Amino acid sequence: MINIYTDGASSGNPGPGGFGVILHSGKHYKEISEGYRKTTNNRMELMAVITGLESIKNPGQVIMIYSDSKYIIDAVEKKWVFNWVRTNFKDKKNKDLWLRFLEVYKKHQIQFTWVKGHNGHPENERCDELAVQASKQMNLLIDIYFEKEELKLNL
């Protein structure tokens, strides 16, 4: 089994943000993080999960994802995201990331475990640390889809 621990953070919503991921299986351990200049907490939570899953090269893996994001866990476990696909994400945010998530989701056997954030869970705390550090980097990435959508709303 592969364990993926994730967290996302943003300073302001929207604002600078980042995500942190830990992949752990047996002796293998990897940390990943990235920061964006303008994004939202939910986008960073979702990017953490996507990045973790996209890091797994062999399909058909049994994966446990640990997240403190009810947004993601409820969307998948309560099947909301599959209904959003049927309605072409009408009035829903983060379509680009949900479609990207679904591409990797179908390649594996995935389960989610909710962990309470900022409650002493070592891997969640480390992912939070990675996410916050990433959001404070000098050369932040551009969340192109988000910034383009936000620009449309403000025109």
Predicted regions and their residues:
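Short, mixed-charge aromatic SLiMs
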Residues: I73-D74, L151-L155
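RNase H-like nuclease fold core
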Residues: M1-M47, L53-Q61, E129, Q137-F146, ...
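RNase H catalytic domain
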Residues: T6-N13, I50-R126, L130, S135, ...
